[in-house]
Amino acid sequence: MYKLVLMRHGESQWNLENRFTGWTDVDLTETGREQARKAGELLKREGYAFDLAYTSVLKRAIRTLWIALDAMDAMYTPVGINWRLNERHYGQLQGLNKAETAAKYGDEQVLIWRRAYAIAPEPLDLEDPRHPRFDGRYAKIPADQLPATECLKDTVARVLPFWNESIAPAIRAGRRVLVAAHGNSLRALIKHLDNVSDDDIVGVNIPTGQPLVYELDEDLKPIRHYYLGDAAEIEAAMAAVAAQGKAKKD
């Protein structure tokens, strides 16, 4: 049996402000740093150790990983950083407040933009300074692979090559792997691992800073999965994620 641990980054500044973040490179809040520290302490307390870790090129995920590994006294762990683990690109929605957007367009439309499998928000213009082609960290990525917007289907198509070429072979080689990434890049992995339907993936919410353990058989098929930590706290965090895209009630 193999084990894989997935972890969404701790609370970011735009999580706190309830804004669509996507590829915008915002940092963790103090709460987010504390979540990462507690996650690392929990992993250490439960006896977890890792031979290899992976994360995205966005600082909120990188810093979460650093803090967690530091709390485990394991900052020597080799880390692979790859753009394919980035958050889903939210196009023109990036930077907008989710509740205000819901008040303008309706809860249902925002839920579609946030969670529908094959519907993407309006793309960024090619000349928009927020377009990733203007960001030096993507300079070596072919221009036709850089998104101006994405739906979850697009995110799955981006993430799975990295799973197939890097993460899965490492697990099969017996390496203990931790992936610190983002809500939607992790949903892409979960959809693949659990064979979640396009409709059901809409209801999958991943809380920040909570280690999610997958026990896998020799074919990397899930035997079971579970969050470490307090169940009530995790349920509340998942409910909070689900509520982010709803208009505020007076």
Curated annotation (Swiss-Prot):
- Identify the residue position(s) of the site Transition state stabilizer: H182
Pathway field: Carbohydrate degradation; glycolysis; pyruvate from D-glyceraldehyde 3-phosphate: step 3/5
Q: Which reaction does it catalyse?
A: (2R)-2-phosphoglycerate = (2R)-3-phosphoglycerate
Q: Which residues form the active site?
A: H9, E87
Q: Does the keyword Isomerase apply?
A: yes
Q: Which InterPro entries match?
A: His_Pase_superF_clade-1, His_PPase_superfam, PG/BPGM_mutase_AS, Phosphogly_mut1
Alphabetically, the GO molecular function entries are: phosphoglycerate mutase activity
Q: Which UniProt keywords apply?
A: Gluconeogenesis, Glycolysis, Isomerase
Q: Which residues bind substrate?
A: 8-15, 21-22, 60, 87-90, 98, 114-115, 183-184
Pfam families, per the entry? His_Phos_1
What is the stated purpose of this protein?
Catalyzes the interconversion of 2-phosphoglycerate and 3-phosphoglycerate.
Q: What NCBIfam families is this protein classified in? A: pgm_1, PRK14115.1
Family assignment from sequence similarity: Belongs to the phosphoglycerate mutase family. BPG-dependent PGAM subfamily.
Q: How does it assemble?
A: Homodimer.
* Descriptive protein name: 2,3-bisphosphoglycerate-dependent phosphoglycerate mutase
Name its species.
Answer: Bordetella pertussis (strain Tohama I / ATCC BAA-589 / NCTC 13251)
